[in-house]
Amino acid sequence: DHGFCYPQGTTDRGGEFSHIPMLWLGGAIKQPLEVDKIMNHADLAATLLGQLELDHSMFPFSRNVLGSDYVYPTAFYSSGNYFTFRDSTGVSAYDIRANCVSYEEPADNGERLNRGKAILQSAYDDLSAR
């Protein structure tokens, strides 16, 4: 999932997101299931720890996608001078250097874009506090 987009033909600055399969095998899995939700790669930590019934509070950007409190599925990624945010309403991509929306589908009332900006700011705040 780093360095190239998958499946082939997917771009990292538009409405398409990488679909990265993940297989979990062994004791952490209580029963077979397929999870088809919008989620982020950072959610892996909280989800796995949740299955093991371990605390995941040290991962503030990770959510347990199998938990009952996972009610607002989202995906976010940033690279260089842009970020992309997806939720059930659609996807918004923002070019930070150009200070403009570079992709939006469907048109957004600004809420989706603001959520993406808030996540990016929170990540910067977290990094600067370390």
Residue ranges of model-derived segments:
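Solvent-exposed soluble domains appended to multi-pass membrane proteins
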Residues: 1-130
